[in-house]
Amino acid sequence: MRKIVLDTNCLLIRLPKISPYRIVWDAFLRGSYQLCVSNEMIEEYLEILSLKINPRIATNVVSTILSSKHLCFVTPYYKFGLIRNDVDDNKFVDCAIAIGAECIVSNDAHFRILQAIPFPAVKVMDIASFAATCL
């Protein structure tokens, strides 16, 4: 099964039922891929979803993720520090490397630097491209 890492903004935009990216959330729920997360990522998901939507929905979304059998939980023991423009984004990179994820799904421009780093290789897909693979 595919293992992917999803950045927080992509999680946020895929949740509404009218979102063109809702297919990404639905694909996770039916087991089309495994969502790979770390403690740091879960904390960020909860924080940002609470601020942007509301705390109750944030708790429900995170609880759904954590209780899913399609979850890959990892504790990255090494911090690669590959993204320097927004060091908070490194939590997603470290998770992807530690679990051997197929890709990070992100629309964040800070992740583009990863294309120029040969090792460790980390593939990044924007959410539209990833959504097209979920059909």
What name fits each language-model region?
Residues 62-83:
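Acidic catalytic patch
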Residues 1-19:
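Metal-dependent nucleic-acid phosphoesterase active-site entry motif
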Residues 82, 90, 102-103, 109-135:
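Acidic, PIN/NYN-like endoribonuclease modules and their adjacent C-terminal/linker elements
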Residues 11, 41, 110-111:
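Alpha-helix capping/helix-boundary segments
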Residues 8, 86-90:
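Conserved glycosyltransferase catalytic-site signature
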Residues 7-8, 37-38, 107, 126:
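A secondary-structure boundary/capping signal
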Residues 6, 20-50:
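PIN/NYN-family metal-dependent endoribonuclease catalytic core
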